[in-house]
Amino acid sequence: MPMPREIGQRLRELRGATPRENVAKACNISVSALSMYENGSRIPRDEIKIRIANYYKLSVQCIFFMNQWHV
């Protein structure tokens, strides 16, 4: 399982140039929560992982559990 910082890096790569506010609103989470996930200081609850995965049209496993990452 990847470390929180690796997951955060994945989330930042997925977001790209999209404003953090847009992703947070679409996932129904706060901007500060998304920032903490992207910085690796927090791991989202399972419910939030599903929302994030659905937003990016990827599986929860792909984003949060795979050791290898390719965008």
Task: List the model feature ranges, each with a label.
Residues 1-17:
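A short, Lys/Arg-rich alpha-helix, primarily the initiator
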Residues 10, 33-36, 62:
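Residue-level recognition of specific faces of alpha-helices
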Residues 12, 21, 50:
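Active-site phosphate/pyrophosphate- and oxyanion-stabilizing loops and adjacent acidic/basic residues
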Residues 17-36:
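Short alpha-helical DNA-recognition segment
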Residues 28, 39-41, 68:
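Residue-level detection of the helix-turn-helix DNA-binding "recognition helix"
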Residues 31, 41-42, 60:
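The DNA-contacting recognition helix of HTH DNA-binding domains
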Residues 62-71:
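Short amphipathic recognition helices of helix-turn-helix/homeodomain-type DNA-binding modules
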